[in-house]
Amino acid sequence: MEGSDFLLAGVLFLFAAVAAVPLASRLGIGAVLGYLLAGIAIGPWGLGFISDVDEILHFSELGVVFLMFIIGLELNPSKLWQLRRSIFGVGAAQVLLSAALLAGLLMLTHFSWQAAVVGGIGLAMSSTAMALQLMREKGMNRSESGQLGFSVLLFQDLAVIPALALVPLLAGSADEHFDWMKIGMKVLAFVGMLIGGRYLLRPVFRFIAASGVREVFTAATLLLVLGSALFMDALGLSMALGTFIAGVLLAESEYRHELETAIDPFKGLLLGLFFISVGMSLNLGVLYTHLLWVVISVVVLVAVKILVLYLLARLYGVRSSERMQFAGVLSQGGEFAFVLFSTASSQRLFQGDQMALLLVTVTLSMMTTPLLMKLVDKWLSRQFNGPEEEDEKPWVNDDKPQVIVVGFGRFGQVIGRLLMANKMRITVLERDISAVNLMRKYGYKVYYGDATQVDLLRSAGAEAAESIVITCNEPEDTMKLVEICQQHFPHLHILARARGRVEAHELLQAGVTQFSRETFSSALELGRKTLVTLGMHPHQAQRAQLHFRRLDMRMLRELIPMHADTVQISRAREARRELEEIFQREMQQERRQLDGWDEFE
């Protein structure tokens, strides 16, 4: 692709994302499906703006690579060891059972047994990018089903190695392409990467961090991610697996959070590019000429994988309420199928349109997953949001709550317990199934679902409630919920959790004045205790705390118009200096007033 063409493609991708994703979110079909539809629109079978899909699809795999690096950072080696049973037990069983069933079905449709085996293995894999994205959107990350889903995806990445090695054997060209010496060298190189990463990465990042230049740290992070991806690609292994291992090696380092911050913007954009590329690769010509075959194939693929995953989840002991989430989120074909089927095609394992039909099936199955997860959400909502069971003893029998609490993590639980202790009627909205199960056992009135859905808020009693307390983890969810409440339930008093100063500014701009910055109050309290240990009078330390809180809040309000304007940063610094001067002046006055206090104690 020429340089100018590459730039044009970049502009088209950005335009497609900016136009399609907000529209998809407004229609309630999710960002992932929006990216896929945008790819269809600008691809060779849509408006035809971009024709070189294969090159862009390979480049867009970097989105999955960055995502796996961040996931690796969140898992330390001891946690990975704890997951070994689910990785090599459930993960291996899912791949083998799904591949066997799907290969058998392909043989019934005139595939040779060699092509059927490759097709079955490729179709058994799930989309790492899509599954992890949906798990995050649905709040499954910390649930049992989310942990099990991640284990299955990790085993699938490990299975890439033997699957690719199997292709030349099935094609009957093992002598020509299957070099055991070369494989041994690759294994040694892989082990060398593990050992080198274990002992070299932290000293290298310590040296880079000592420079104090943030841009260099970001560049080093990108070098690590891209370098490990290219190294694994050169070995013929999964790029995503390489960056995942790099992330795990740095999971216990002091640079973990800084690495996440440096990578996050690139991950989001490249993941969007990946989904757009998948949409572009959909061959509408094959879909048109083999419509019935493709539709049946997609239905059978999704049904077989759901059946296998559901049964494995049941055998593993996953709660019944979480099994459908686990099965649904992994029910699609994956990006690895594109690589495996291309390799098999180069070995002439497929005949006629077989490869094109398989790729169309995989692509369409990926498009069904967001819709399938919405159906699962509706089913779970009916199951959990219906009338209370007789054996449950809720604290409150009144159907009209005074307060709705959105999110029941550590922050929300403290608020909920305080309100319950004072006999307030509350209803909790939570999208983590495991949390819903636990809270209901303790008698909380909990609704499962996405609180940004107006119907759920209405059924939870928002029209009769007096206040809503928003404790969402994601700032985007908080602001969306504020907008919905102001539009549909204007009578509600909105109280919100702000994760930081930027979110506090956004809440103030939206008209929300009752909010709490999650670390501010506790930091101030610890600061007050520190002043006392340094010899300051307790009353004086208390006054210092109150002054600081009041003046900081005043500065927060004064800087609302410029919080997002980088040109105004200098003004923020001036305001901070002013705050310090006012603080020192008032504290000097306090000291004069307190000079004689100690002698009376």
Curated annotation (Swiss-Prot):
InterPro entries: Cation/H_exchanger_TM, K/H_exchanger, K_H_efflux_KefB, Na+/solute_symporter_sf, NAD(P)-bd_dom_sf, RCK_N. It is found in: Cell inner membrane. It is a multi-pass membrane protein. Keywords: Antiport, Cell inner membrane, Cell membrane, Ion transport, Membrane, Potassium, Potassium transport, Transmembrane, Transmembrane helix, Transport. One of its GO terms (biological process) is proton transmembrane transport. Residues 400-519 form the RCK N-terminal domain. PROSITE patterns: RCK_N. Pore-forming subunit of a potassium efflux system that confers protection against electrophiles. Catalyzes K(+)/H(+) antiport. This is Glutathione-regulated potassium-efflux system protein KefB. It comes from Escherichia coli O1:K1 / APEC.
